[in-house]
């Protein structure tokens, strides 16, 4: 995980404008974004990402966690503390927390 650059503009067809218009992303949109992000970050196929597997099991170190939460926060236009991954340790949990 040396290169933590993820092309967030290419993650999905979702964009900030549509999120802001409806007061935040849906649970499904959050899951789709996180799956796409991890797929790119970890060089895995989307099918290899499980919404119920903990971020720790994917081997995210602190640097990757900071990148993920920063990029996710940019996507939803909110500042996200990287320690949120301890409270919501799976894609499913994050989606339930942040999804509308």
Curated annotation (Swiss-Prot):
Superkingdom of the source species: Bacteria
SMART domains: PKS_PP, PKS_PP_betabranch
Keywords: Fatty acid metabolism, Lipid metabolism, Phosphopantetheine, Phosphoprotein
GO terms, biological process: fatty acid metabolic process
O-(pantetheine 4'-phosphoryl)serine modification, residue list: 62
Domain named Carrier: residues: 25-100
InterPro entries: ACP-like_sf (IPR036736), PKS_PP-bd (IPR020806), PP-bd_ACP (IPR009081)
Cofactor(s), names only, from the UniProt record: pantetheine 4'-phosphate
Induction entry: Part of the jamaicamide (jam) biosynthetic gene cluster, encoding enzymes catalyzing most or all of jamaicamide biosynthesis.
Polar residues biased stretches: 1-16
Span list, region Disordered: 1-25
Gene3D superfamilies: ACP-like
Function description: Carrier protein involved in the biosynthesis of jamaicamides, which show sodium channel blocking activity and fish toxicity. Accepts as substrate the activated form of 5-hexenoic acid from JamA.
Protein name per its UniProtKB record: Acyl carrier protein JamC
Organism listed in the record: Moorena producens (strain JHB)
Gene responsible for this protein: jamC
